């Protein structure tokens, strides 16, 4: 078992322009303060204010956006981190675990990971993800690349179709097709931080947002030992080399996770479970009284003194006792949130410490709040009620379907760029406008400069005479379109779709 020494994990070095050495605790703190500044001031964080949490295109400022949700996650993450450090101090383990001079960076890395955890999410949340993946699956047919005769391959892209006698190229084609059909917000977050925004964060800070450890091109069965850690794609083929270096710098075995990521994940789970229900009441999907009844019915029979009684019933009774009846809803959610935090945060901290050997190594194959405890049951209660009463509400489903259509429609609109030959697209990139390609020229001009530069840089690194050049160029071209559309805010995507479909 590896010795627990966080000095080997909280790596303050960066990929580029890293200080040659640090001499004091203050030097290390300054490095992580620089990370904070880069993150807080990044456009990716600002765009979260117009991205969906639960209710797309919401005009009511009291309802959460991705940004306000992320700020709440940041605060809960800070709370858990402080609780962990406080308990380790009581146990006199800070020095033994190499944390005595790293408490500030420990908290900061968790906080900033919490703030960043949703930056890769596309417009309209999970329905935006589904729209991107469905659109590419219909055209690339990744399943056809796995087993049946090559003649049955339905892939529409010539450069990605399988060919007899090209074993190594076919293996790469399979990877590329699977990768492009596995868009995921967490993987896009890694791409944003490193490839698109070039934030040059410390290795520890980036490691903390690598929530899932499965490569997006993975098509084999997931190992049972890492079934939870690899349940979703965590990074793309484009970032394979960077993630390999990240693992080396953080001393992580393949498919293992950075220790502080478990805290970020727990903070997210705690934050959204209550917030989604509060937003539903704000939207008048149900009243606070109806919500209490939903929670009561879903929990079932219980004894006085149970966790439900201490958290939910206590919040309800205190809010009813308030003489200002018009603020009873606000009072209920204030008490519910406080009661929930006071139970789940210490429990998450205790789970982190109790499982620290596996967490430090990176192969603890569970979430901190995923077990058979009452705390886990309370979290599941909130999630199940939200799933049944909020996400299945007709108004929410209609907005999600509209979001799915918007993203699918935008991909249709930009498809001419993906249908160009390699020669034509290369000419368009070089000249930016080509007279004989009027539609493609106008579409290319609409792509952001940052995304176009990322494409150009990636393609320029390829050997043009290599057999895989055409398929890898097409891969980066698809990434270009995915980067652009996934980087839109909900409102921008909605307006862009309406403009280009000529419906206004």
Swiss-Prot record:
Residue ranges occupied by any HD domain in the UniProt entry: 66-273
Uppermost EC category: hydrolase
Oligomer status and interactors: Homotetramer.
EC number(s) on file: 3.1.5.1
Name assigned to this protein: Deoxyguanosinetriphosphate triphosphohydrolase
Similarity annotation: Belongs to the dGTPase family. Type 1 subfamily.
Top-level taxon of origin: Bacteria
Example of a GO MF term: dGTPase activity
Cofactor(s) this protein cannot do without: Mg(2+)
Keyword Acyltransferase attributed: no
GO BP, sorted A to Z: dGTP catabolic process
Keywords linked to the UniProt accession: Hydrolase, Magnesium
SMART domains named in the record: HDc
Organism whose genome encodes this protein: Klebsiella pneumoniae subsp. pneumoniae (strain ATCC 700721 / MGH 78578)
Cross-referenced InterPro entries: dGTP_triP_hydro_central_sf, dGTPase, dGTPase-like, dNTPase_1, HD/PDEase_dom, HD_domain, PHydrolase_assoc_dom
Reaction(s) the record says it catalyses: dGTP + H2O = 2'-deoxyguanosine + triphosphate + H(+)
Function field: dGTPase preferentially hydrolyzes dGTP over the other canonical NTPs.
Region forming the signal peptide: none
């Amino acid at each position: 078992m590896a010795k627990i020494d966080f000095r080997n994990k909280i790596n303050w070095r960066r990929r580029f322009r890293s200080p040659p050495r640090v001499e004091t605790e203050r030097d290390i703190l300054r490095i992580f303060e620089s990370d904070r500044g880069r993150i807080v001031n990044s456009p990716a964080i600002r765009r979260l204010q117009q991205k969906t949490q639960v209710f797309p295109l919401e005009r009511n400022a009291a309802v959460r956006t991705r940004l306000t949700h992320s700020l709440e996650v940041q605060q809960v993450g800070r709370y858990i981190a402080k609780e962990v450090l406080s308990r380790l101090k009581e146990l006199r383990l800070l020095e033994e675990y190499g944390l005595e001079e790293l408490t500030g960076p420990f908290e900061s890395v968790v906080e900033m990971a919490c703030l960043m955890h949703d930056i890769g999410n596309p417009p309209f949340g999970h329905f935006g993800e589904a729209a991107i993946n469905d659109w590419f699956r219909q055209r690339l047919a990744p399943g056809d690349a796995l087993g049946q005769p090559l003649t049955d391959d339905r892939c529409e892209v010539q450069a990605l179709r399988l060919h007899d006698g090209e074993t190594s190229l076919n293996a790469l084609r399979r990877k590329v097709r699977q990768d492009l059909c596995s868009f995921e917000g967490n993987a896009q977050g890694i791409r944003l931080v490193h490839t698109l925004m070039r934030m040059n964060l410390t290795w520890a800070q980036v490691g903390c947002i690598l929530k899932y450890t499965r490569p997006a091109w993975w098509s084999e069965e997931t190992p049972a030992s890492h079934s939870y850690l690899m349940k979703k794609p965590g990074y793309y083929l484009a970032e394979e080399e960077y993630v390999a270096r990240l693992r080396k710098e953080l001393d992580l075995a393949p498919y293992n996770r950075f220790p502080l990521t478990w805290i970020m994940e727990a903070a997210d789970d705690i934050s959204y479970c209550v917030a989604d229900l509060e937003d539903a009441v704000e939207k008048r999907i149900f009243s606070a009284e109806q919500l209490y009844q939903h929670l009561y019915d879903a929990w079932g029979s219980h004894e006085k003194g149970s966790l439900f009684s201490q958290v939910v019933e206590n919040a309800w009774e205190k809010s009813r006792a308030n003489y200002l009846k018009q603020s009873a809803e606000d009072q209920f959610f204030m008490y519910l949130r406080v009661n929930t935090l006071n139970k789940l945060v210490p429990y998450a901290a205790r789970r982190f410490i109790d499982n620290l050997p596996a967490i430090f190594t990176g192969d603890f194959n569970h979430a901190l709040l995923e077990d058979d405890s009452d705390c886990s049951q309370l979290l599941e209660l909130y999630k199940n009620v939200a799933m049944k009463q909020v996400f299945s509400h007709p108004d929410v489903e209609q907005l999600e379907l509209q979001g799915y259509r918007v993203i699918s429609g935008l991909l249709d609109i930009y498809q001419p760029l993906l249908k160009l030959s390699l020669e034509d697209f290369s000419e368009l990139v070089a000249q930016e406008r080509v007279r004989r390609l009027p539609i493609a020229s106008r579409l290319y001009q609409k792509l952001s400069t940052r995304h176009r530069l990322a494409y150009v840089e990636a393609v320029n690194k390829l050997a043009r005479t290599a057999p895989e050049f055409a398929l890898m160029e097409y891969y980066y071209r698809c990434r270009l379109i995915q980067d652009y559309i996934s980087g839109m805010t909900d409102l921008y995507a909605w307006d862009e779709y309406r403009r280009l479909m000529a419906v206004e």
